[in-house]
């Protein structure tokens, strides 16, 4: 065991906290986008993503993803790290980390950091199924999805598994697959899962005929800014050390995000005649998503290019749901699916020393495409099985009357804005 690097430990713990903050950021981002009658339901679904995921992570999620002996390069043995028994030890009655990792910070810090990634990934999904899903079904889905979808895919990509830089796919192509912070594991995975559930549960009542406008755009903007801030932990923290790569990932992340916000705005201006706050917020998230897999391997110029391309493509993609007839309520597929795929594939063009336009050849592009495709198939199949089973047993949706009346009142028994109650209290005081 090496000597503890307290600087690395402090940075990764800070990054874990920043990534944790992203899920409350998503709660505001999505909460502002839904109608007023569904904001509490959306926010409590985000709370469930945090809570259920953390319990599963401690029980067996960490072991499946990172601790257990690899089974075919697909998942780790869930027993090895069950209840974190491989990661924590008691020292005189006080628990501490069992060991240091290769960057000389405690494994317990890794457990914290990676748990926050699992939380934000499943939290992204609920935006697609807003305003119509039972909270109880969502909680069960989170537990099953983290266990059978997220943890194995994280193992495959980030723990030396099938889709990793050292995995069988990379060896077969002769190029190392690269996903710095989650283009496949987080964004493609969440977006495909969201699409599959949407296709199984169907559209909201009134989709395509009624305007579903965001009820609180300032909430959306606040959420976008919190996400931008939290993403510094997401990307720069994925250097797993307080070093120059972390610093550069911070810079490339902001450069791509800024470019995406601007390019989304220009695209929106051409199409609608306006630069909207909703567009700015969505462009910010699109840029953050697209640079995630590539933040450490693209030059400043290519980071800006990736952001600009992603801003345009995601803006255009968000309108496809109306043409194709699927109700992705808050554009999870358009932003995270298209953005994540764009960033993952563009490494094959712009990755330093390996991309077609950056001193490399076609092999990097092939391996990036192949890994993205396998991630899509994995997410679609696993999510499809889970979502279909839930649909045929306990069911996903609230009743039509509950949906029309407002899922907040039906499922939570609360209103976000009790104007009638406030007015009544004021009148009583006046009298």
Say what each PLM segment does.
Residues 1-431:
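Glycine- and aromatic-enriched membrane alpha-helices
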């Amino acid at each position: 065991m090496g000597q503890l690097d307290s600087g690395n430990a402090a940075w990764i713990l800070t990054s874990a906290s920043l990534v944790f903050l992203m899920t409350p950021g998503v709660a505001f981002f999505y909460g502002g986008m839904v109608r007023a009658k569904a904001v509490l339901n959306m926010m409590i679904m985000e709370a469930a993503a945090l809570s259920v995921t953390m319990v599963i992570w401690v029980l067996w999620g960490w072991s499946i993803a990172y601790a257990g002996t690899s089974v075919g390069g697909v998942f780790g043995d869930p027993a090895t790290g069950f209840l974190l028994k491989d990661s924590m030890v008691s020292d005189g009655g006080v628990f501490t980390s069992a060991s240091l990792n290769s960057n000389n910070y405690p494994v317990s810090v890794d457990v914290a950091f990676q748990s926050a990634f699992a939380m934000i990934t499943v939290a992204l999904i609920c935006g697609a199924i807003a305003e119509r899903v039972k909270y109880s079904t969502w909680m069960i889905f989170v537990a099953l999805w983290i266990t059978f979808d997220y943890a194995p895919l994280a193992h495959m990509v980030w723990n030396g598994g099938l889709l990793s830089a050292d995995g069988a796919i990379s060896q077969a192509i002769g190029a190392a697959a690269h996903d710095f912070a989650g283009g496949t594991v987080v964004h493609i995975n969440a977006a495909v899962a969201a699409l599959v559930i949407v296709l199984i549960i169907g559209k909201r009542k009134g989709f395509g005929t009624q305007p579903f406008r965001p009820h609180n755009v300032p909430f959306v903007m606040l959420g976008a800014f919190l996400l931008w801030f939290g993403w510094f932990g997401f990307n720069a923290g994925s250097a797993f050390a307080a070093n120059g790569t972390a610093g550069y990932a911070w810079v490339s992340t902001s450069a791509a995000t800024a470019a995406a916000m601007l390019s989304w705005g220009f695209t929106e201006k051409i199409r609608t005649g306006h630069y909207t706050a909703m567009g700015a917020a969505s462009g910010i998230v699109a840029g953050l998503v697209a640079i995630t897999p590539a933040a450490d391997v693209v030059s400043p110029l290519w980071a800006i290019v990736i952001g600009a391309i992603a801003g345009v493509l995601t803006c255009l993609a968000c309108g496809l749901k109306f043409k194709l007839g699927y109700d992705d309520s808050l554009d999870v597929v358009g932003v995270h699916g298209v953005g994540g795929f764009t960033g993952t594939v563009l490494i094959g063009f712009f990755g330093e020393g390996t991309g077609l336009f950056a001193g490399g050849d076609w092999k990097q592009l092939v391996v990036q495409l192949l890994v993205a495709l396998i991630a899509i198939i994995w997410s679609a199949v696993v999510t499809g099985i889970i979502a279909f089973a839930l649909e045929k047993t306990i069911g996903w949706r609230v009743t039509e009357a509950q949906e029309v009346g407002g899922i907040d009142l039906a499922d939570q028994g609360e209103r976000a804005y009790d104007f009638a109650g406030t007015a009544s209290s004021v009148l009583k005081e006046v009298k």
